[in-house]
Amino acid sequence: MSQHFHHNPVRVKSGSLFATASEALQARLSKIKRKDKECQAYFRKVIKSTFFQIVMITTVTTNSFLLVLGTNYDIQFEFFRTFEVSELFFVSVYVCEFLMKVYVDPITYWKDGYNILDVIILIILTIPYLLRKIKGNHSAYLHFADGIQSLRILKLISYSRGIRTLIIAVGETVYTVASVLTLLFLLMFVFAILGFCLFGVTDRGDLENWGNLASAFFTLFSLATVDGWTDLQEELDKRKFTVSRAFTILFILLASFIFLNMFVGVMIMHTEDSMKKFERDLTLERNLAIMEEKQIILKRQQEEVNRLMNTQKSGSMNFIDMVEGFKKTLRHTDPMVLDDFSTSLSFIDIYLVTLDNQDVIVSKLQELYCEIVNVLSLMLEDMPKESSSSLSGLS
């Protein structure tokens, strides 16, 4: 007890001291001002450009294709020099990529797990050269070193956001999947002991599949994947085990139809959540990019207006005087082209008021026209009476 209470504070204190020291070191490094900011910004722009990503994806894909061709001995023997030159080229490209990224962000580079993966791949690339240099071309581990060169295709992960999303989804399912696999292991343990006791007897049992605990586990794994379970059941039927069919059906129902489907369901749920989150992030990034473009355009327009207002025209006339003079020369019949003027709130307000006034004027004109028509009709009715009276007077 005393050791327990005296050990933990020391470890916590040492951990806090390490964290404090790392934070202090990081703060001190962040205060260092670089004198090559323009060059750093240029390389950052190059690394984040679409062209650079396409070049790296093409390089990794071509390298993987040549690795596949290298598995054919005849092709490798015929184009030996081509493979050697291409290998040097690919390694040079990977090293240049590493140096550029470290140059741009020498501190934050090591905080990204995918960058650490790239560094590990670079180390793996150097293993065959070191073995040939130290042990010669007949080293026992040289074939293994050549085989793990296929891991360089994992560099595509850092350039594919979709693959990174799937990896995040798999990482989020670790605890749930571990729980499901633990339950499956417990189920297999129970059925392995039961199968060993029922079908692993020495006189007439199936010793090849149920003779010991290891073979029983392997047999249950075949039953869980429903791979060759009919052959296993035929072996038990030949030995006339009456409960073998019930045992097999029960284990397949529990392991294959429940636990494995539960495992697949958990993976699908987390993958869907990650894909929805990925789509939301893409939408948010698009909206942010549009907002940034709008801000840049507005800032540029404001700078242009300020520049025009600050510049003086010949004859001591500034921008405001120019606008006032331009207003005096305008007529209501002059055509004008206004960009985005109709989207302003002031224009919409004036336009709505104008429409209301126009409606009022139209209604008044309609009333006036009705009155005019009424007066004209009355005048037409009175005209025959006046003509008849004039004719009677003449007679």
From Swiss-Prot:
<feature type="transmembrane region" description="Helical; Name=Segment S2">
    <location>
        <begin position="81"/>
        <end position="107"/>
    </location>
</feature>
<feature type="topological domain" description="Cytoplasmic">
    <location>
        <position position="108"/>
    </location>
</feature>
<feature type="transmembrane region" description="Helical; Name=Segment S6">
    <location>
        <begin position="243"/>
        <end position="268"/>
    </location>
</feature>
<keyword id="KW-0744">Spermatogenesis</keyword>
<keyword id="KW-0969">Cilium</keyword>
<dbReference type="GO" id="GO:0051649">
    <property type="term" value="P:establishment of localization in cell"/>
</dbReference>
<keyword id="KW-0406">Ion transport</keyword>
<protein>
    <recommendedName>
        <fullName>Cation channel sperm-associated protein 3</fullName>
    </recommendedName>
</protein>
<keyword id="KW-0221">Differentiation</keyword>
<feature type="transmembrane region" description="Helical; Name=Segment S3">
    <location>
        <begin position="109"/>
        <end position="131"/>
    </location>
</feature>
<feature type="transmembrane region" description="Helical; Name=Segment S5">
    <location>
        <begin position="169"/>
        <end position="195"/>
    </location>
</feature>
<keyword id="KW-0282">Flagellum</keyword>
<dbReference type="Pfam" id="PF00520">
    <property type="entry name" value="Ion_trans"/>
</dbReference>
<dbReference type="InterPro" id="IPR027359">
    <property type="entry name" value="Volt_channel_dom_sf"/>
</dbReference>
<dbReference type="GO" id="GO:0006814">
    <property type="term" value="P:sodium ion transport"/>
</dbReference>
<dbReference type="GO" id="GO:0005245">
    <property type="term" value="F:voltage-gated calcium channel activity"/>
</dbReference>
<feature type="topological domain" description="Extracellular">
    <location>
        <begin position="196"/>
        <end position="216"/>
    </location>
</feature>
<feature type="topological domain" description="Cytoplasmic">
    <location>
        <begin position="161"/>
        <end position="168"/>
    </location>
</feature>
<keyword id="KW-1003">Cell membrane</keyword>
<dbReference type="GO" id="GO:0031514">
    <property type="term" value="C:motile cilium"/>
</dbReference>
<feature type="topological domain" description="Extracellular">
    <location>
        <begin position="72"/>
        <end position="80"/>
    </location>
</feature>
<dbReference type="GO" id="GO:0005783">
    <property type="term" value="C:endoplasmic reticulum"/>
</dbReference>
<keyword id="KW-0812">Transmembrane</keyword>
<comment type="subunit">
    <text>Component of the CatSper complex or CatSpermasome composed of the core pore-forming members CATSPER1, CATSPER2, CATSPER3 and CATSPER4 as well as auxiliary members CATSPERB, CATSPERG2, CATSPERD, CATSPERE, CATSPERZ, C2CD6/CATSPERT, SLCO6C1, TMEM249, TMEM262 and EFCAB9. HSPA1 may be an additional auxiliary complex member. The core complex members CATSPER1, CATSPER2, CATSPER3 and CATSPER4 form a heterotetrameric channel.</text>
</comment>
<dbReference type="InterPro" id="IPR005821">
    <property type="entry name" value="Ion_trans_dom"/>
</dbReference>
<keyword id="KW-0813">Transport</keyword>
<keyword id="KW-0472">Membrane</keyword>
<dbReference type="GO" id="GO:0030317">
    <property type="term" value="P:flagellated sperm motility"/>
</dbReference>
<dbReference type="GO" id="GO:0048240">
    <property type="term" value="P:sperm capacitation"/>
</dbReference>
<keyword id="KW-0217">Developmental protein</keyword>
<feature type="topological domain" description="Cytoplasmic">
    <location>
        <begin position="1"/>
        <end position="48"/>
    </location>
</feature>
<keyword id="KW-1133">Transmembrane helix</keyword>
<dbReference type="GO" id="GO:0036128">
    <property type="term" value="C:CatSper complex"/>
</dbReference>
<keyword id="KW-0107">Calcium channel</keyword>
<feature type="topological domain" description="Cytoplasmic">
    <location>
        <begin position="269"/>
        <end position="395"/>
    </location>
</feature>
<feature type="topological domain" description="Extracellular">
    <location>
        <begin position="237"/>
        <end position="242"/>
    </location>
</feature>
<feature type="intramembrane region" description="Helical; Pore-forming">
    <location>
        <begin position="217"/>
        <end position="236"/>
    </location>
</feature>
<comment type="function">
    <text>Pore-forming subunit of the CatSper complex, a sperm-specific voltage-gated calcium channel that plays a central role in sperm cell hyperactivation. Controls calcium entry to mediate the hyperactivated motility, a step needed for sperm motility which is essential late in the preparation of sperm for fertilization.</text>
</comment>
<comment type="similarity">
    <text>Belongs to the cation channel sperm-associated (TC 1.A.1.19) family.</text>
</comment>
<feature type="transmembrane region" description="Helical; Name=Segment S4">
    <location>
        <begin position="144"/>
        <end position="160"/>
    </location>
</feature>
<keyword id="KW-0106">Calcium</keyword>
<dbReference type="GO" id="GO:0001669">
    <property type="term" value="C:acrosomal vesicle"/>
</dbReference>
